[in-house]
Amino acid sequence: MAGLELLSDQGYRVDGRRAGELRKIQARMGVFAQADGSAYIEQGNTKALAVVYGPHEIRGSRARALPDRALVNCQYSSATFSTGERKRRPHGDRKSCEMGLQLRQTFEAAILTQLHPRSQIDIYVQVLQADGGTYAACVNAATLAVLDAGIPMRDFVCACSAGFVDGTALADLSHVEEAAGGPQLALALLPASGQIALLEMDARLHEDHLEQVLEAAARASRDVHTVLDRVVRQHVQEASVLLGD
């Protein structure tokens, strides 16, 4: 990536966006009738699909059941054609396991699990195309799928990435910006309360700049919430029309 100018003197990024500007987001809910909830999202060229089953009885050993809340199970996978590498990734490889764990931690903080003790909620997310902000796209798709399943949440959980280039915080990083190797973080936020569901950081960043990058990610996550809220309202309206309400 040597020699590539990530931020021009005029304040424009490689893809023409301003520093705090999101890539275009398009999303749909209810894309799979067989699942309790489902959603598809595009954030720029990153595309993710999420399906949700539950709450249902614990599968396997009953000893896994939690007496005071639901067990949240999250599994992540990426299609072999999702990146330019065309590399076959075995199910359950390290990256997939780490992403599944991050998603579980995120949604345990957002779902009102205490309303469904001794039950299980399964969230499956697959990335169909990866072009930066993979974790964020997975969270945002899963949020819509959980809502589509009618599972109560404390709030939407909305996610976005951010990085730091030439003294400027950049929101919603593309693959080119991520590959440049600068400091970057991923944030999952409950926008109404401002509670952080998950924060992960790659590479070192001086504490003087951390607040700036964190605020860029939080602001972008709130912008994501505006989009997702509109998607949910549109879905509810379309469902009401189909039901004749």
From Swiss-Prot:
Please list the disulfide bridges: none
Under the heading PANTHER family, the entry gives: EXOSOME COMPLEX COMPONENT, EXOSOME COMPLEX COMPONENT RRP41
The UniProt function text for this chain reads: Non-catalytic component of the RNA exosome complex which has 3'->5' exoribonuclease activity and participates in a multitude of cellular RNA processing and degradation events. In the nucleus, the RNA exosome complex is involved in proper maturation of stable RNA species such as rRNA, snRNA and snoRNA, in the elimination of RNA processing by-products and non-coding 'pervasive' transcripts, such as antisense RNA species and promoter-upstream transcripts (PROMPTs), and of mRNAs with processing defects, thereby limiting or excluding their export to the cytoplasm.
Keyword set includes Membrane: no
Keywords attached to this entry:
Acetylation, Cytoplasm, Exonuclease, Exosome, Hydrolase, Nuclease, Nucleus, RNA-binding, rRNA processing
Identify residues that carry N-acetylalanine.
2
- Native organism: Bos taurus
Give a single Pfam family match: RNase_PH_C
Membrane-spanning ranges: none
Say which domain of life the source belongs to. Eukaryota
GO BP annotation list = defense response to virus; DNA deamination; histone mRNA catabolic process; maturation of 5.8S rRNA; nuclear mRNA surveillance; poly(A)-dependent snoRNA 3'-end processing; positive regulation of cell growth; rRNA catabolic process
What do the Gene Ontology cellular component annotations say? cytoplasmic exosome (RNase complex); cytosol; euchromatin; exosome (RNase complex); nuclear exosome (RNase complex); nucleolus; nucleoplasm
Main subcellular location of this protein, as a coarse class: cytoplasm
Q: What is this protein called?
A: Exosome complex component RRP41
Entry-linked SUPFAM superfamilies: Ribonuclease PH domain 2-like (SSF55666), Ribosomal protein S5 domain 2-like (SSF54211)
> Which Gene Ontology molecular function entries are recorded, alphabetically?
exonuclease activity; mRNA 3'-UTR AU-rich region binding; RNA binding
